[in-house]
């Protein structure tokens, strides 16, 4: 009887209290013991690989860091590169952070430029939103490119990755440095070799914008 009574009483509250609480608990356990373990291992592996790469070729490291910033634009690869860059600042390797930031600035700037140069490759809504990405890119907000990448990942992501990788490699080649972990153009006064850093951003942006114009299909 007590079991029956409990079922009758819990019936109305189960959908609004018990089920959500159980779902949150299960999700928390899954994230803690499965997702965090897997992602922690991946991040550790990436960090070790990047550290080892830094001992062999700075330009290749810059290329990889820049490309990682555009692979998922705010996802695990992007964040792994960013964390590596910020940790490098503490270690006195300011050139790593410079490559990371210029790689993250490139995708939004490239999409903004491409939406102006190749209007037939973007929808009306994308053309209207495109110029806003100049501001986001210059402020080092890579996520501004996400809607464009989500709508056409096959063509947008490779274009952005190539340009970001080129920007990161150029930054490292000219020994550009950055002591700030964020800020975009607002921290250019503390960038070492700022002129070539700007060149890296412009070249990376042009490469990605041109690739977007070539690879993207015309909007019907």
Label each residue range with its predicted role.
Residues 1-219:
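Pore-lining transmembrane helices
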């Amino acid at each position: 009887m007590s079991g029956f009574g409990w079922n009758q009483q819990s019936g109305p509250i189960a959908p609004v209290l018990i089920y959500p609480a159980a779902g949150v608990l299960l999700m928390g356990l899954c994230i803690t013991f499965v997702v965090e373990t897997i992602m922690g291992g991946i991040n550790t592996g990436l960090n070790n690989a990047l550290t080892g790469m830094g001992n062999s070729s700075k330009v290749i490291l810059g290329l990889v860091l820049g490309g990682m910033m555009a692979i998922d634009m705010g996802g695990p690869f992007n964040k792994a590169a960013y964390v590596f860059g910020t940790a490098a600042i503490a270690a006195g390797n300011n050139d790593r952070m410079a490559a990371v930031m210029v790689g993250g600035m490139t995708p939004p700037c490239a999409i903004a430029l491409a939406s102006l140069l190749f209007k037939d490759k973007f929808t009306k809504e994308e053309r209207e939103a495109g110029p806003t990405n100049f501001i986001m890119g210059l402020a080092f907000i890579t996520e501004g490119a996400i809607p464009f990448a989500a709508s056409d990942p096959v063509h947008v992501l490779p274009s952005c990755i190539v340009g970001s990788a080129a920007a990161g490699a150029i930054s490292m080649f000219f020994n550009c440095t950055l002591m700030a972990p964020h800020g975009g153009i607002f921290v250019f006064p503390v960038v070492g070799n700022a002129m070539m850093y700007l060149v890296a951003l412009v070249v990376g942006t042009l490469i990605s914008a041109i690739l977007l114009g070539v690879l993207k299909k015309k909007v019907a």
